[in-house]
A protein has these predicted regions:
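Structural recognition of the beta-propeller blade-terminating site
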Residues: 186, 231, 271, 312, ...
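Hydrophobic alpha-helical membrane-insertion segments, chiefly the h-region
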Residues: 12-15, 81-91
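Repeat-blade elements of multi-bladed beta-propeller folds
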Residues: 90-92, 114-124, 152-182, 200-228, ...
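Sec-dependent N-terminal signal peptides
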Residues: 2-5, 68-80
């Protein structure tokens, strides 16, 4: 039995845990996190039980026993050896990052263009509606992209697409060897170009800026996760920055600075070139992706003193805050002096026993709530604001459209499953995806579907969609956990 347990711990992967906001941490993960301390306590206990005086007598007795029980002794040595090896792997986990780049050293990064989808939500404003974004107008069969690198991977990260390259992170490994991988693949044929291994699984999405890739690592139970900066052309390591928590947040890069949430370690602002710390706002638990408006940083908190917080871009000081009754999970979108945040109970894995959700609109001039629209379950998505309309998804299985000025209802679309992906908008269409793999193009005005396709038709009935779609050049790119990366539409088919 002991051998069986040891083998399972060594070779069976962790049950998929969407340990993102709020905290989801299984008993086994808790035990693993405490393993170094437990080993120390065990060592002290052994030392207390066995006095120095009795060691010689016991060693002699052990020799006699081992000679009489050779088979059992071998098994015992294997079990102990396995535990020791696993512990070494666990404690040495911080040393695993490294690149496997295939491009030539010095290969140029793809230039950013007007139609680039360079970060989560398409641009640093988290709009979901970049200026020249174009998505597919008609349905087509989803094509699996990057099978060699991404097939059946855990994909919580949303892709970025710049030029003919797609960037995304995946998670994998087993209980004692879980890790993350940052990928760059050819967006046309899925050929792997380079990958970079991180010590922990990740939920953060890649940001392309200045020829570099910025991305965080870690889920809720990690306490020393890092933000990485890589060369976008080669995948070579440039610098990293270690926090005292997890970096599920997708960073924002603006004016030579990288700003990101680090869970209960607050918000950091780093120099984008060197990774040097500029400021650190402590005392906040931030998992969403910050937005920068003029000389301020907008974030929300889901634990502790829940609410909306506005920080000074230069110093990180809290300028003002607006308390909320429920956790703020949806990354803010800003337009015309108003910021829109998703609120609620529940998380990416399940609904809360007492579900609640809402979209909150905050007037940045008056520092007060402009309006709030309640839903039947949590709003974990970032809204897309286009003109006088705001679009967002909810765990209550619906995509909503509201008047952005006063929050009045326009329409809602029944997606048939929780909507955990943030919508993208282009050319009169709202693109959305449900957790069970339906991808739909919804008419912005009527709320009626123009087309629907199902990722499960590709042969992955158990897939889950947590990541958000990226649109560019008449195509839609989206990842599904336990499946892979898919592309819908032909280039230029708008």
């Amino acid at each position: 039995m002991v051998c069986l347990i040891a083998a399972l711990l060594l070779f069976v992967g962790v049950q998929t845990t969407y340990a993102v906001i709020p905290e989801l941490m299984g008993p086994l993960q808790s035990l693993i996190a405490l393993l170094p301390q437990l080993l120390v306590v065990a060592a002290v206990g052994v030392g207390a039980v066995f006095s120095v005086r009795g060691w010689r007598t016991r060693i002699a007795a052990w020799r006699v026993y081992l000679s009489a029980h050779r088979t059992g002794s071998v098994v015992g040595v294997l079990v102990v050896g396995g535990i020791v090896a696993s512990t070494v792997l666990l404690l040495d986990g911080r040393d695993v990052p490294g690149g496997t780049g295939r491009l030539r050293p010095g290969q140029d990064a793809p230039p950013l263009s007007a139609d680039s989808w360079s970060t989560f939500r398409g641009d640093m404003a988290r709009s979901g509606n970049p200026l020249d974004a174009e998505g597919p107008q008609v349905a087509s069969t989803p094509v699996e992209l990057g099978k060699e690198a991404l097939r059946q991977a855990e994909l919580y990260s949303s892709p970025s697409v710049v030029g003919d390259r797609l960037y995304v992170s995946s998670s994998g490994g087993s209980t004692f060897q879980a890790f993350g991988l940052i990928h760059c693949i050819d967006a046309t044929d899925g050929a792997p170009l380079w990958s970079f291994k991180t010590a922990y699984k990740g939920f953060s999405s890649p940001v392309l800026a200045g020829g570099r890739v910025y991305i965080g690592e870690g889920l809720h139970h990690h306490t020393d996760a890092r933000l990485y900066c890589l060369d976008a052309g080669t995948g070579d390591f440039v610098w990293d920055f270690q926090t005292r928590s997890h970096v599920e947040s997708t960073p924002t890069v603006v004016n030579g600075r990288v700003i990101f949430g680090a869970g209960d370690d607050g918000v950091y602002c780093l120099d984008a070139g060197s990774g040097a710390e500029i400021w650190h706002a402590e005392g906040l638990h931030v998992d969403l992706s910050p937005s920068v408006v003029a000389d301020t940083v907008l974030v929300g908190t889901g634990y502790g003193e829940m609410g909306v917080y506005v920080l000074d871009l230069e110093t990180g000081d809290v300028l003002w805050s607006l308390p909320t009754e429920y956790g703020v999970w949806g990354s803010p979108s800003v337009q015309a002096g108003k910021a829109y945040f998703g609120l609620g109970n529940g998380d990416f894995a399940r609904s809360d026993p007492e579900p609640y959700g809402a979209l909150l609109c905050v007037d940045l001039a008056t520092r007060e709530q402009a309006w709030i629209y309640e839903t039947k379950d949590a709003v974990l998505t970032a809204p897309a604001v286009v003109g006088n309309d705001v679009y967002f998804g909810s765990r209550d299985w619906h995509l909503y459209a509201l008047n952005a000025t006063d929050g009045t209802f326009r329409w809602r679309y029944d997606a048939g499953a929780p909507v955990l992906a943030s919508p993208a908008v282009a050319q009169g269409i709202v693109y959305t995806a449900s957790e069970d793999g339906e991808v739909a193009a919804i008419d912005r005005v009527t709320g009626e579907p123009r087309w629907q396709v199902y990722l499960t038709d590709a042969g992955y009935p158990q897939l889950r969609v947590l990541a958000s779609p990226a649109i560019r050049g008449g195509q839609l790119f989206i990842g599904a956990s336990e499946a892979g990366m898919f592309v819908i539409g032909d280039p230029g088919s708008t």
